[in-house]
Structure formats: C-alpha cells, structure tokens
Amino acid sequence: MTDGDILDLKPDLPDFRKEILKGLQSPSKWIHPKFFYDTNGSLLFDKITELPEYYQTRTENSLLIEKCESLSILLKDIESAVELGAGNGQKSFSLIKCLPGLKEYSLLDISISSLKGAVDYLKTAYPHIEIHGVCTDYLNPETMYMGDSTGKILIVFLGSTIGNMEKRDSINFLTSCNESMSRGDAILIGVDMKKDKAVLESAYNDSSGITARFNLNLIERIKREFCVSIPDGTFVHKAFYNEDIGRIEMHLVCTRDFSMTLDGAIIRFFKGEEIHTENSYKYTPDEFTEMLSIAGFPNPERLTDTRGYYSIFIARKP
C-alpha cells in the first residue's frame, strides 16, 4: 500500500432489520451492541468518553502517556503496528510516540469515514511514518490485515473493547490473533479491571444522562428504519454490575404493556420486560493473564494506573 492510502475490503455490513427482528422475537429480547454506532450513536459515544464518570478512555490514554518509556523498552523492536478498531485515531496518536522503531502503522475499522479522518490526522502528526487505513471487519480473522513490513509486528486492541465479547469469544479472538502472528510478534490490549461496584455503575449511569441517550438511541434507530411509532418514555435505560458474572449489563426496560409491528411481525412487550443491549466484562489481572495464556501468549507484561482501575497488557508470541 502507498503511504496515506485507505484499502476498502468492503466488509459485509450487518442487516439491521433482520437482526433486530431476530433479537426482539427471542424469548429473552436482545439487540447486538454493534448497532449502537450509527452517526448519532457514534457522536454520543464520543461524548461519553469525555464524561467525568467514564474513567476508561481517560485512564487508558494517561497510561499510554505516563508509561511511554516502559512501552518503548518493551516494544523497541516493533517496526509495524496494526490497530483494530482504530476509530478517530486519538489512541493511535499517543501510542505511536512509544514505538521508537516504528516504520508503518495500519488502522483497521469498519467505518471508512472514521478511517479517512484518522489517517489524515496521523499523517500530519507523523509524516516520517507510513500510515495506512483498512476498512474491514477487524474481528474476522479471515480479513485481518497485518501490514507490509517483514519486521516485528504489534497488534493493538485498545478501548477495553475486549470486554464487550463473551469470555469464550475473547479467548477465540486472541487465539486467532496468535495464529496470524509470527514468532516474536506482540499484542497490546487495553483491559478494564474489576473494582468497586459503585465506580463501575456510575460510569454507565452518568449524571448527564448521555449513556442513557446512547442506549435509547437504539429505539430511535428502530423508529426511523422501520417507520414505526414508539411513544417517548416507552423504554428507559438500565445499567448495573452483575457481580456473579463480572460484567456491566445494559438493558432497555419497557415501562408499560406495549406492542408494535415490524415488517409484519407483531412484537409484544409487557411492563418491566427488558431488551439486553450490551455486556462489558471486567477482569482481575490473574483472570486476563490466564486468558492470554490459553490463547498462546504466556507471561504477559502489565502496566496499570495507581488505582488499579485499568491495565494495558503486552504479550509476545513465543
């Protein structure tokens, strides 16, 4: 690829109508969290990352800055980096400073519009590094792009996105990454740690109500794309920490008996019925270290903040 190029692998986009019908016709109703991120949802999530209660983005970026010297030692031989779910490139900007031998940085994302902005931003900031964008389903190992470098490669997976996967899926994903790597290549992952329940629940129930709007935007999208009427207040936001499973759960709760017709199918809700919209798993250091080991990454390094809220794990393929 030429420096500054964007390679569009034309990923298969999910069928919103089909998957919404499937989820809402299930005995326990659900909507996949990938549908949060339409244009309005993406804007709302950007606002979430700036909220005082939402420590994850702020803490991760602080770690990349404060632990840059440690990262530069651990990753001094890395020549090429591939970031999965790069978004707007803000995380990339901080990390690139910590990779002294870097020659090439590839950003992978399913949104080509996000990639264009991120590539332009990083190319201006780092003109001496080859910056590429790849529009692809970065969670699909069959379309994983590993760059053009013949040197050591780093896979980057920040934003605690690994927590949105079920544990078994996380291990399978990490195993797929391992299988695409060569000996000595590295992986860097941002992971949200288990902590006080009140801190966790506050992060998903902010006082400004932005997270509630983000969750309820799914209802707005259903109204718009199915041309259906759903009165305001029919659903409310709910988020809580399930201590038994170790995850934040987000739901939409129906406030009254209600029915609607979607593509000819009658969808009925009873008062108090919930639509499960997202999980976000939290881990202890030992739990995530074990997951990495199972996936073929033994003895990872871990960098964390003083409170132990968030960790960056770095591991090599032996």
Each language-model region and where it sits:
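N-terminal auxiliary segments of SAM/dcSAM-dependent transferases
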Residues: 1-34, 42
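Conserved class I S-adenosyl-L-methionine
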Residues: 77-87
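Conserved beta-strand signature within the Rossmann-like core of class I S-adenosyl-L-methionine
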Residues: 180-194
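Substrate-binding/catalytic lobe of Class I Rossmann-like enzymes that use SAM or dcSAM, i.e.
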Residues: 201-281, 285, 289-295
